[in-house]
């Protein structure tokens, strides 16, 4: 794709997700989420992005399986457009957070977005590593359940059966589509470093190191919030029941 096409696709994506956010803002919001309507709309917009790009990334490999054999040079217009659209979303979300939230509360996500925009930007501008970028977007399959978890918590449904089921699916997809994907990408980068220029290899290595560290921390937070806490509450209930029987 030419530079003009990249700019048009990315710019259109920024506008599209702005419209999505605007449209979501017109829908009813749970009473428990009204005190932070901006966060509710922001997470809901992120959910839409994850749903679109998660499905799109799988379709890229289904429609163009040759890309899996060569993640550097081989790609389709369909997969290139996916990466450009994702850049547009991350630019939109970056600006949305900078404008509506204190940086001290969102610096981790802002830093994450800068890293992703940089890495994906190199890919779409050089028309190389597009397949590698599409592999990275497979993590959005997990993000669907991750964002749904946040929405359910804001709607005060953290104790519902649906939330518990989503937590289990979220944990499973986290391991498969985040941890395993990042591990595979790191291995691929190391094995193919002779085929990658030093600058791109350095950017990719630093980006993956940052993503891996952030995802390990997030995994611990999820475990502590959804499983360790539930386990402790269950133990406390059992202790109280024993005390009643005595």
Curated annotation (Swiss-Prot):
GO terms for biological process: membrane assembly; phospholipid homeostasis; plasma membrane organization; regulation of membrane lipid distribution. Keywords: Cell membrane, Membrane, Transmembrane, Transmembrane helix. The keyword Membrane applies. Coiled coil: none annotated. It is a multi-pass membrane protein. It is found in: Cell membrane. The chain crosses the membrane at residues 5-25, 43-63, 79-99, 107-127, 128-148, 199-219. Disulfide bonds: none annotated. Pfam families: TRAM_LAG1_CLN8. The keyword Cell membrane applies. GO terms for cellular component: plasma membrane. Residues 35-231 form the TLC domain. It comes from the Eukaryota. Belongs to the TLCD family. Regulates the composition and fluidity of the plasma membrane. Inhibits the incorporation of membrane-fluidizing phospholipids containing omega-3 long-chain polyunsaturated fatty acids (LCPUFA) and thereby promotes membrane rigidity. Does not appear to have any effect on LCPUFA synthesis. This is TLC domain-containing protein 2. It comes from Danio rerio (Zebrafish).
């Amino acid at each position: 794709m030419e530079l003009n096409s990249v700019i048009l696709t990315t710019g259109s994506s920024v506008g599209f997700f702005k419209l999505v956010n605007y449209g979501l803002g017109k829908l009813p919001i749970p009473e428990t989420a009204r005190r932070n309507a901006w966060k509710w709309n922001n997470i809901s917009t992120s959910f839409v992005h994850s749903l679109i790009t998660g499905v799109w990334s799988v379709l890229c490999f289904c429609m163009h399986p040759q890309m899996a054999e060569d993640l550097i040079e081989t790609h389709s217009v369909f997969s290139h457009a996916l990466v450009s659209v994702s850049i547009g979303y991350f630019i939109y979300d970056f600006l949305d957070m900078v404008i509506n939230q204190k940086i001290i509360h969102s610096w981790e996500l802002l830093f994450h977005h800068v890293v992703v925009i940089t890495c994906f930007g190199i890919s779409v501008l050089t028309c190389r590593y597009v397949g590698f970028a599409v592999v990275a977007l497979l993590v959005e399959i997990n993000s669907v359940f991750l964002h749904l978890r946040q929405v359910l918590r804001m709607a005060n449904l953290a104790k519902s059966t649906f939330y518990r089921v989503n937590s289990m699916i979220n944990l499973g997809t986290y391991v498969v589509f985040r941890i395993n994907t990042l591990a595979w990408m790191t291995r691929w980068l190391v094995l193919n470093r002779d085929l990658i220029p030093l600058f791109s290899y350095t950017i990719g290595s630093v980006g993956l190191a940052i993503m891996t560290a952030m995802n390990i921390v997030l995994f611990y937070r999820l475990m502590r919030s959804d499983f360790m806490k539930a386990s402790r509450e269950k133990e406390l209930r059992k202790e109280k029941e024993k005390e009643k029987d005595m």
